[in-house]
Amino acid sequence: MTRTLIVWGAGRIGRGFVADLFDSPAFHTVFVDIDRALVEELNARGRYTIVHATRDGLSRRVVQNGFCAVHTDDAQALNALFEEDQLLLDVAVHEPKLPEVSDMLLPLLRHRMTVCPNAVMDVMMNVNMPHPDECFLSLTRERFTDAESAWFTAHVGVTGIFAMCISPIAPEWLLKEDSLVLFNNGYPEQAIDKNRLKGEAPALPRLRLTEDVAREETRKLYTLNMAHALISYLGLPMGLKTSREAAINETLRPILTGALEEASFGLSRELGFSEDEMTEWRQTILRLLENPYIEDSLQRLGADSRRKLGAYDRLVGPARLCAKHGKPPVQLAKAIAGGYSYENDDPGTHAVRDFVRAHGFEAALAEFSDLHPGDGIYEYVCM
């Protein structure tokens, strides 16, 4: 039986990573997106290129057939999809869009409950944030009645994911060849929590089933995503432009490695990763950042500083674990401080900078990062 995979969000991760993992005769992939022009182009062409850029070089593959695209306004097509047995849904959107996507999914889930109340489905949350599965569950429960919540709990599995796919905008020379091209680091797998699934677990070579995906999600957020934020907030004032340029910079490198060591210290004591595991993990992160083909923009990596400076997000989160277990988060604190000076033309960053100008740096630390004197972090950020 061919199963349907809905990828909600046909962007760089949805098309370039998730659909690549599920490119199998066992699955029919349906992209759902709000961009009508993209939906029409995908359907008209029926193919697109993915370029994997690893340290060893570039490789290409063409994804064709086996997929179609649907616009978010096409209620009839979406209702039909949500009647499929053993349905899989991968939500691949940016964190700020999650409430909006939850609102779009609500009538579709209600339709499924009405038309096929005994059918099960599973949702994979491919959203770059702490605990996206719990956030999605909270958003749905806020919108459901008690009876609907009971049905949802019994028939819909929701799992976070773990992956380290880095997917910047494709270079101009590739876009000239194929306007739909995706460009990423060729990360080989995605992990999901098998204990959260209601339906049959997908059997695919690059989909790994784990028993605690939240632990792996947290490690990734507090190391790889932390590193991206750090090199952005500290690299831009130095005149650096790209992730690789920052990762190998002789001034910034010791701060980066020191912050990774601080994060590792907290993670190993809080979540049980061994020192050997974390040493190997840090080397993996550095190799990803040193990839000569993935020149991600530091300006892009720092965007939405309000979110990235959040109390349990990629910078303050590992600093809290580090301080909790007795180690001063000196290098992480430098990145947190740098984030409050970051400038970008997005609403989250504007909110941070406007607040700093109106109320001062210390008040902003309390407002956005929940940092206060005596918490083991505040003093180092204010040094």
PLM regions with names:
Residues 2-6, 12-383:
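Substrate/ligand-engaging "lid" and interaction regions
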